[in-house]
């Protein structure tokens, strides 16, 4: 993605910066201090940096997610385990799990099987949601998903049944 396209995406989402418009304190904290955290963490310097800005930006997000949620089992289908382990040392990569704690997967048609194994504390990150918008919208509106965050480059879904369903656009 070139810098002009990046700038256009950012400008289009400018009114969704830093949690503006989010009424839920829990969701606001998640957006402000996990998704859009700008302070350098203790392990940022040790994390891989191959020059790809998007891979690095998403990797730092996965680091912050793991740091926040502290999962023991992670389903990683996109190769970000270095970032996840830096955020949670006890995390181990699994191919499959009875109950999902944290999953980072490419957006795909077979999401139904994955969502069936999600509990109230599960977090699933779908990558490249902008490439398959219709599929992302069907995931957002799935009855099992309670909170969905559209970050353009990826989507994060939560499953806490005590909360009212809500879908957010976040300028990431």
Residue ranges and their predicted role:
Residues 1-119, 130-172:
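A short alpha-helical cap/connector motif
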Residues 122:
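Glycine-centered, small-residue-biased loops immediately flanking beta-strands
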Residues 126-127:
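Generic beta-sheet signal
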């Amino acid at each position: 993605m070139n810098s002009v396209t990046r700038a256009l995406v950012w400008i289009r989402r400018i009114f969704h910066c830093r949690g503006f418009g989010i009424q839920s304190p829990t969701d606001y904290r998640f957006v402000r201090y996990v998704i859009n955290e700008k302070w350098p963490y203790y392990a940022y310097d040790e994390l891989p940096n191959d020059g790809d800005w998007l891979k690095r930006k998403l990797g730092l997000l996965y680091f912050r997610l793991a740091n926040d949620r502290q999962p023991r089992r992670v389903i990683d289908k996109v190769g970000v385990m270095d970032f996840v382990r830096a955020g949670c040392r006890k995390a181990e990569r699994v191919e499959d799990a009875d109950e999902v704690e944290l999953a980072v997967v490419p957006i795909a048609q077979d999401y139904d099987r994955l969502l069936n194994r999600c509990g109230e504390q599960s977090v699933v990150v779908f990558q490249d949601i902008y490439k398959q918008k219709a599929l992302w919208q069907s995931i957002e509106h799935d009855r099992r998903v309670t909170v969905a965050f559209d970050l353009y480059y990826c989507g994060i879904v939560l499953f806490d049944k005590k909360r009212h369903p809500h879908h957010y656009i976040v300028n990431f």
